């Protein structure tokens, strides 16, 4: 390698390093206001709620049995787990809903809120133990918001937010 090549390489390296040594103030912020799948529908289709069939809901929550007494804009489930534990679950999708609105309602009802990101979607969990350990996980999705609410009937212990987030994750991962 010639002395000229080494000198040019040295000057370029110094100029490049000097140009990159710039500090930017502030705090990085996540982009808000968009969802990864703005045109996707999460409504009740083909006997599935939130794109999940009953067996997927049952397997996701480790239940022995699942009953869906109501389906439509809102779907209700009653699951039984080993040890005589009954779990009440509700799915809802509001196609023109707002994550901000759902968050405000949860706060007004006294829920403990926690911001989360689920499958690249802005979301939050809302824990509110009134008639049993209960939690919802809600995300901006498609044109609106979807939510899974889980309550351990008659139980004051456990973390239903884990199960609500599992169902939300399964929904956001689903392909029609």
Segments (PLM) and residue ranges:
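Bacterial signal peptide processing site
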Residues: 21-24
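Post-signal peptide N-terminal segment of mature Sec-exported envelope proteins
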Residues: 29-48
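A short, solvent-exposed beta-edge/loop patch
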Residues: 109-176
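Extracellular secreted precursors and ectodomains with disulfide-bonded cysteine-rich loops/domains
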Residues: 18, 47, 73, 133, ...
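Sec-dependent bacterial lipoprotein signal peptides
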Residues: 1-19
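Amphipathic alpha-helical segments
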Residues: 45-63
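Short, solvent-exposed recognition patches
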Residues: 62-127
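Short, intrinsically disordered, charge-biased short linear motifs at domain edges
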Residues: 4-10, 32-37, 58-66, 146-149
């Amino acid at each position: 390698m010639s002395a000229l090549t080494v000198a040019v390489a040295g000057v370029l390296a110094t100029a490049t390093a000097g140009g990159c040594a710039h500090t930017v103030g502030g705090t990085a912020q996540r982009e808000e206001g968009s969802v990864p799948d703005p045109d996707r529908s999460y409504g009740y289709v083909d006997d599935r709620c939130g794109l999940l069939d009953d067996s997927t809901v049952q397997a996701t929550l480790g239940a022995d049995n699942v009953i869906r007494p109501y389906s439509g804009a809102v779907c209700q489930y009653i699951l039984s787990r080993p040890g005589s534990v009954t779990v009440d679950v509700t799915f809802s999708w509001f196609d023109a809903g707002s994550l901000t609105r759902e968050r405000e309602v949860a706060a007004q009802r006294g829920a403990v809120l926690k911001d989360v990101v689920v499958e690249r979607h802005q979301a939050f969990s809302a824990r509110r133990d009134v008639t049993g350990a209960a939690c919802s996980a809600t995300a901006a999705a498609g044109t609106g918001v979807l939510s899974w609410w889980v309550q351990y009937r008659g139980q004051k212990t456990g973390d239903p937010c884990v199960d609500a987030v599992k169902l939300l994750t399964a929904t956001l991962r689903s392909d029609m």
